[in-house]
């Protein structure tokens, strides 16, 4: 049974990227969940859209200091269940930056305290945050290493 194997290995999603002979960049991933939220769909986030990096209106715990505005439009698969912030499972922005959430059971560790000088971001909002704020992989790396703290705050 594949579920028993995955549970024994603490398996998770995978992704891959490659460059074609004509210098195009491709990215793909699998989705290792046996179900996906019914409300999931293709989501477009326009440039100039306000949203939050931490907290939800559904749970009445929005962190106002994390409010931001998208610098770049993005499109991908996701859900708008949280109202205050669209959640992208994966997507691409107008500059060609691509990414996705990869669940890898038992390996992810998040912070209980926000690092000084950073913005708190809940893990489910990370892809949305990076795709709407970064125009290059270098900007993504800088954002993750220096400008945000992934917080250990579950949704729902």
Regions found by a protein language model. Give the residues of each.
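N-terminal mature-domain region immediately after signal-peptide cleavage
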Residues: 1-139, 149-151
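Internal, well-folded beta-alpha domain core
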Residues: 142-156
């Amino acid at each position: 049974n594949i579920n028993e194997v995955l549970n024994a290995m603490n398996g998770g999603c995978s992704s891959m990227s490659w460059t074609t002979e004509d210098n195009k960049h491709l990215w793909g991933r699998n989705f290792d969940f046996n179900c996906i939220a019914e409300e999931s769909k293709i989501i477009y986030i326009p440039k100039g859209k306000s949203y939050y990096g931490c907290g939800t209106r559904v749970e009445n715990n929005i962190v106002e200091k994390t409010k931001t505005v998208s610098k770049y439009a993005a499109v991908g698969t996701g859900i708008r269940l949280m109202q205050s912030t669209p959640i992208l499972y994966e997507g691409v922005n107008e500059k060609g930056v691509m990414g996705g959430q990869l669940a890898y059971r038992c390996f992810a560790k998040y912070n209980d305290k926000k690092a000084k000088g950073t913005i708190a971001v809940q893990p489910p909002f990370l892809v949305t945050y990076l795709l709407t704020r970064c125009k290059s992989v270098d900007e993504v790396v800088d954002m993750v290493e220096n400008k945000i703290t992934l917080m250990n705050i579950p949704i729902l």
